C-alpha cells in the first residue's frame, strides 16, 4: 500500500507463475515462502536488484541464492519487521557485490536524510490511485517531504546497485 510497492501489485500481471499463486497468497493472508521466492524469480532476469524481505532471518539466505543464480549486485533489506528501507528506524542491509556478501546497518542520518517518526510516515500510504498520484507529485515537488526522502532512498539504492553511484549515499544524492 506504500508509494513504491510496485512488485506486489504487478506480479500477477507480469510473472506467469504469480498469476496462479497470487490469488491463493491473498486468500491465505499470511506471509509464505512465496514472499521470499517471488522477488528472486524476477521474470526480467535482472542481475542487479534491491529486494526487501519481511524477516531478517531470510536476508543472508536470499543473498546467497541471488549469488548462486548469477546476480552481479544486490541489496536485501529489512527494517523493523518490514521488507523495505525505513526512515524511522535503522535498516539492515545484506549486500552482494563481486561475489562477496557483507552486512551492515544504515541510519537515515548517515545518508543525509532527516530521521522521521512513524507519525511522519503515516501520511505516505496510498489507499487509492488519486492519493498515490498526489504522493508522487509531492515527492517530485517538495524535496523536504517524507515522500521525497523515501523515493530518494529507494531510487538511490537502485542507482548504487546499478553501478551508477559508488556508494548508497551518493546514490541518494543523485536521486
What are these regions (language model features)?
Residues 9-175:
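Glycine-rich anion-binding loops and their surrounding alpha/beta cores
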Residues 2-7:
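Short, small-residue-biased leader/transition segments that mark boundaries at the very start
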